[in-house]
A protein has these predicted regions:
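Positively charged n-region of N-terminal signal peptides that target proteins for export
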Residues: 1-4
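Intrinsically disordered, low-complexity repeat/linker tracts enriched for polar/charged residues
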Residues: 24, 29, 47, 70, ...
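Conserved anchor residues at repeat-unit boundaries in beta-strand-based tandem repeats, strongest
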Residues: 34-45, 57-68, 80-91, 103-114, ...
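Cleavable N-terminal signal peptides
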Residues: 6-7, 17-18
Length: 125
């Protein structure tokens, strides 16, 4: 009986561990967005690439289907943010680069510039 319980415990544990492994895959969303990258239980988790129908794109980390960690988002108009994300929003250190050549390097909180930062104009000032 003890041998059976040990065997069942090992099988149950190994199935839980292996069922949640990351795999590579593609997801096409109903709005036309397309995700390619690591999946855990069929959800973006880890490194991935998200292309949007309007031409925007995101390359970076996902956690449980949400943008989290380091990444870069580039919009179709050329606006670019590279830095930290939390719960799908810019949060932490990052760099905003505008199509005009202007740049903001600094802190973000809840998707907005917040805290210390440096603004550089397109002429270098």
């Amino acid at each position: 009986m003890r041998q059976i319980l040990i065997t069942l415990s090992i099988l149950l544990f190994s199935s839980l561990v292996f069922s949640s492994e990351k795999k590579l895959g593609n997801i096409t969303y109903s709005n036309g967005a397309n995700y390619k990258g690591e999946l855990k239980d069929g959800i973006p988790n880890g490194l991935g690439f998200l292309s949007l129908p309007d031409g925007g794109k995101y390359v970076g980390e996902f956690k449980e289907g949400i943008i989290n960690g380091q990444g870069t988002v580039t919009l179709s108009d050329g606006l670019k943010y590279s830095g930290e994300f939390k719960d799908g929003k810019k949060h932490g250190q990052g760099i905003y680069t505008y199509p005009t050549g202007e740049k903001y390097v600094g802190e973000f909180k809840d998707g907005k510039k917040h805290g210390q930062g440096t603004w550089t104009f397109s002429d270098g000032r």
